[in-house]
Structures are given as structure tokens and as C-alpha cells.
Amino acid sequence: MTEREKMLSGELYDSSDNELEQLRLHARKLARRYNLTDEDQQEVQTQILRELLPATEELPYLQAPVYFDYGCHTYFGKYSSANFNFTCLDVGEIHIGDNVMIGPNVTLATPMPVSYTHLRAHETAANLV
């Protein structure tokens, strides 16, 4: 089982795994690009969101700035939107339903820190629906 599979199933995993590091880096680069686009650059924003949120069919309206750990673990329903400073710590899957309006400065967080000292080198996560 890969570290990503462990992470998504809620098991202890190594967050320094190369695949996970590359996915996080990619998501942060895309979010940074999105945040730097002007609101009238809708085609560019759409292209970035398609890459950042590949599993979302109907893209939401996201008011920049936005932040994601992975992006590919976040799923938006139809006609959803999020105001500025929207943060998704999508270590586990995040499912946002249809017609959801998210206010400013909202964080959706799935990571669960491990409380035992000998396990703190690892993290776990739970899905958020």
C-alpha cells in the first residue's frame, strides 16, 4: 500500500513521501498561479482549476486567494462557491455538495495530529463530507 493510499484510508502514513511532497508542491504552485490572476482572466482561472481540482466536473467560483494541500482530494458539487481565504487541508477527501456557499476565511481541515510521542513522525486524516 502506498503512503497516499494509507493517507486516504485514514491510516498512519509518512507525510514526507516523495509522491505526496510532489502532489503538495504541484497544488501549491497552481493555487499561487490562481491567486495571481486577475478576476477578468476567467479562461486562465478555469484552466488552473481544472488542473487543481481534476475530479470536479462543474468548477466552483473561488474568490482568490485560495489554498490547498493537494486539490485532487477536494470535490465540489454543482453551483458551489467560496469566498476569499478559502483553505482546504485535503489530506483526506473533502466533498462539498451542490449549491454550497462558503464564506470568507474558512478552513476545511482533515488532518488529525497523532497524540503519542513515538507516532508524531506520522499523520492521519479522515474524510470530510
Name every feature range the model reports, one short phrase each.
Residues 1-59:
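Terminal amphipathic alpha-helical/low-complexity segments used for targeting or macromolecular assembly
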Residues 32, 37-39, 85, 99-100, ...:
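Short, intrinsically disordered/low-complexity patches at protein termini
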Residues 117-124:
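Conserved small/polar residues in nucleotide/adenosyl-binding loops
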